[in-house]
Amino acid sequence: MALKDTAKKMTDLLESIQQNLLKAEKGNKAAAQRVRTESIKLEKTAKVYRKESIKAEKMGLMKKSKAAAKKAKAAAKKPVRATKTVAKKACTKRTCATKAKVKPTKKAAPKTKVKTAKKTRSTKK
């Protein structure tokens, strides 16, 4: 199928789905079933359309319309804000040395387990 045929098929399916949805809202069970089946057909057709459109883009068959081309040019002409870059001051020996020094943290003393006396059984007979 050509890209145009696929697009036409998709629009026809969308229109019929829309009509059947209106009928299904009123309680028509057959229309509800048609909506379900046509939505599956639409899904498959959309998959084919995606493949064809990618193929057409690669071959250069898809052309931008004049209005879309003008919008793209207008968007390109907008001035871009320059981001300010803040220059870092050169490190002097004092500032770099103080930043580089890390104060050692005190380690907590290891906890020792408290020994408990073992209970012995009395062996009275």
Curated annotation (Swiss-Prot):
Key words, A-Z: DNA-binding, Repeat
Location of region: Disordered: 98-125
Family from the record: Belongs to the histone H1/H5 family. HCT subfamily.
Protein name: Histone H1-like protein Hc1
Domain of life the protein comes from: Bacteria
Source organism: Chlamydia trachomatis serovar L2 (strain ATCC VR-902B / DSM 19102 / 434/Bu)
GO molecular function, one term: DNA binding
Stretches with biased composition (Basic residues): 100-125
